[in-house]
Amino acid sequence: MRKLVLLRHGQSEWNKENRFTGWTDVDLSVDGVSEAAQAGRILKKNNYTFDAAYTSVLKRAIRTLQIVLYEMDLLWIPVYKSWKLNERHYGALQGLNKDETRDKYGEDQVHLWRRSVEVRPPALEKSDKRYPGNEKKYASLKEEELPVTENLEDTEKRVLQDWRELIAPNIKGGKNIIISAHGNTLRALVKYLDNIPSDGIANLNIPTGTPLVYELDENLEPITRYYLGMDGKIEDDKFPKKV
């Protein structure tokens, strides 16, 4: 049996302000720092250790991972950063308040933009200062790799490239792995691991700063999965069922 730990970053400043974040590189809030430290203490208390870690190139996920590894005395392990583990790109919605956006466009439309597997939010113009091509961290990417908007399917496609090429081979090789990433990045991976249909993933919410543990067989098929608290497993009966 192999264990994989998925961790959504601690609360960010824009989580706190209820704004669409996407690829905007905002930092953790004070509460988010505390959540990350608590996650590290939980993992240490439950005797977890890691051989390598994966994260995005966004500071809220990177900093969460650094805090967790500090709490576990594991700052020395290799950390791999990849833009393919970035949050889903929310296009022109990035920076907007979610409640104000609902008031303007309606609850149903915003729910589709947020939760639909196929529907993309309105796209950014490449002249927009929020376009990722303006950031040095993406200078090595081809123009066609830089999103102006994404749906969950787009996000899943890039996440699974890293999963198949980098992460899964390490797990099969016996490595203990933690992935510190984002709500939609992890929803996309959960959808794949648990073979959840598109209409079953819409209402899945992965909480910030709470370790999600997958126990996998030798073929990386899930045996079980659960959230982890100070006292051990936290079962979640609201988790979508695999088909």
Curated annotation (Swiss-Prot):
It holds the Pfam family His_Phos_1. GO terms for molecular function: phosphoglycerate mutase activity. It catalyses: (2R)-2-phosphoglycerate = (2R)-3-phosphoglycerate. Its EC number is 5.4.2.11. It is an enzyme of class 5 (isomerase). The record marks H182 as: Transition state stabilizer. SMART domains: PGAM (SM00855). The keyword Isomerase applies. Keywords: Gluconeogenesis, Glycolysis, Isomerase. Pathway: Carbohydrate degradation; glycolysis; pyruvate from D-glyceraldehyde 3-phosphate: step 3/5. Substrate binds at residues 8-15, 21-22, 60, 87-90, 98, 114-115, 183-184. One of its GO terms (biological process) is glycolytic process. The keyword Ubl conjugation does not apply. The active site is at H9, E87. Catalyzes the interconversion of 2-phosphoglycerate and 3-phosphoglycerate. HAMAP family: PGAM_GpmA (MF_01039). Belongs to the phosphoglycerate mutase family. BPG-dependent PGAM subfamily. This is 2,3-bisphosphoglycerate-dependent phosphoglycerate mutase. The gene is gpmA.
